[in-house]
């Protein structure tokens, strides 16, 4: 009995010693962690906050950028032009998405030879909401217009994404090129805001099929816009892979050597007008124009006096040139209207 008690006593002392040694080891191991957190805990916390914000922004970038459901009826009702020759068209993209287009025809003098403008709108709404602007283009510029609703907008299928919008723009250009009643040598691109980024991408990939590009109140890139809109966070230090949508127009503009018109409203409260000036300066086009409207806001620059005159002069200049990309003289001009 005594031997048994001595055995259990030995085991108890051994377990206590082991526990004491383990606790000492744990304290030694925890000490560096405690010291590190004490010294750098604020930095670690900031990093965690930074990573969390980046994750949230990545997840909700589509929601913050596209707004296809605004206004609330945008996906249910698309207004159509009345009393004007037009076609309500549906086409398929390379990845099988069904898109809705409206082709508005100019029927005046020399209509078979008039230019065609592919119109890329900004975020929110649908092509029907852009008809007042488009119809004034029709009357003042004497052009055909093809308005496109990107995937996820209006009556088009799918969900909006950067690559998706690029595929949509390619599909529209391909469709225009199949129309025997449209002059393929006079295809102009027009893009406002988000549509400007789509137009720049399409032009950078199809310089041989596009006569000229016109962009209005658009941005350098989504990372640039994030730094502007969320200036209270160090967004400029986020690596590019953190952005689900990039729209790197400031890079792609270097591939747009066709005649280019940059339209800037200096009263734009959403996209800094300096971005339009920077795109103009980055453009390698031999014929580039910057039309500045001091009272122009983000969405309503087209209502400024002299707006359609600037577009008309640019289009006429391009058409008069036999080969816009091979002009012998470099011509750049800034017009304040």
UniProtKB/Swiss-Prot annotation:
Broadest EC class assigned to this enzyme: hydrolase
Entry's localization field: Membrane
This protein's UniProt keywords: Glycoprotein, Hydrolase, Membrane, Signal-anchor, Transmembrane, Transmembrane helix
Keyword Transmembrane helix annotated: yes
Any Pfam family matching the protein: Abhydrolase_1
Protein's UniProt name: Protein ABHD13
Topology term for the membrane: Single-pass type II membrane protein
Residues modified by glycosylation: 299
EC number(s) recorded for this UniProt protein: 3.-.-.-
Family: Belongs to the serine esterase family.
Transmembrane portions of the chain: 37-57
Chief site of localization: membrane
GO biological process, one term: protein depalmitoylation
Species, as recorded: Mus musculus
GO cellular component, one term: dendrite cytoplasm
GO molecular function, one term: palmitoyl-(protein) hydrolase activity
